[in-house]
């Protein structure tokens, strides 16, 4: 899908399920429910697009968001950089630490995705 088509997409897969997802009992349950709806995936992100994915860093004693919601701002050989909406700041994500694929979030879905408390902050041991 071209960037212009992505940005102009009227698709919102979350509109009618967001309340059901929010009412799940844990962040991980909300993430699973979210990924069941966001079935379109990519391996490499496109700059300017929104994604969520499961992240498991290798660096010990680092605080991280296991379920980031990001806007991709750059892609490199080592991974990519994104604005993590749960942190409110830019974070780096390396290829080997991403579990599975990146789940695409369309622009009209971002507001609903941000309303779902699926962030899961952990300290890597």
List the predicted regions and their residue ranges.
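Mixed-charge, Lys/Arg-rich low-complexity intrinsically disordered regions
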Residues: 4-50
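Short, exposed beta-strand/loop patches in secreted or surface proteins that constitute
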Residues: 43-44, 71-74, 97
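Short, charged beta-turn/beta-strand-edge "cap" motif at the junction between a beta-strand
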Residues: 56-62
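Basic/aromatic-rich interaction segments and small domains that mediate binding to polyanionic partners
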Residues: 63-93
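Intrinsically disordered, low-complexity, charged/polar segments
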Residues: 84-125
């Amino acid at each position: 899908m071209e960037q212009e088509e992505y940005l102009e997409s009227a698709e919102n897969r979350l509109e009618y399920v967001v309340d059901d997802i929010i009412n799940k009992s844990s962040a991980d349950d909300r993430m699973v429910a979210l990924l069941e709806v966001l079935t379109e995936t990519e391996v490499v992100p496109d700059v300017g697009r929104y994604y969520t994915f499961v992240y498991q860093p290798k660096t010990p004693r680092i605080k991280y968001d296991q379920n980031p919601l990001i806007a991709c701002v750059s892609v490199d050989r080592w991974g990519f950089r994104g604005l993590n909406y749960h942190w409110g700041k830019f974070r780096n994500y390396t290829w080997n630490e991403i579990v599975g694929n990146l789940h695409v979030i369309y622009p009209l879905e971002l507001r609903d995705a941000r309303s779902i408390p699926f962030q899961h902050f952990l300290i890597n041991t």
